[in-house]
């Protein structure tokens, strides 16, 4: 089962790229803030028509809209149970990660540590793999460096000052965070948070 948080156009584009060979089916979880295109009827209709087409070609498709993020009444345990019951083992996440903190929480609580989710770079549509266990294992030192990036793109030297760590230590941490998809850089000399990094900090209460 593949789970997607999405806006309509990139969701369709990504699934077209993924193909269908060997997949058991798709569980689609559409959610976002009030402006999310997932809530718009045309977007729903386009997605439903697309996956109806897949179903017509023999692909087992399940479409399930859950408008979750931004909803103060969201029952996270209920959502987690629905995902677990659906047999989710990998997530493919679309769009701005600022909307996806709930999804990341569910992933970290429900999926086994060897599972993974993939975050999509909106500009290139490339997929970044992020193991669930790595999310659980990030220690406080790494979180301090992430927090130091909240104010905007920052150099390695300034990050060392802001996080009260040696520059060599910060350099090693940054390499791990870049590999995990939480930080981008250096470009050319500064590092910046990715949407996934911001969502992770939201999970940790910053």
Positions of predicted regions on the chain:
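Short glycine-rich phosphate-binding loop at a beta-alpha junction
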Residues: 88-94
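Long, low-complexity, Lys/Arg-enriched
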Residues: 1-88, 102-105, 109-206
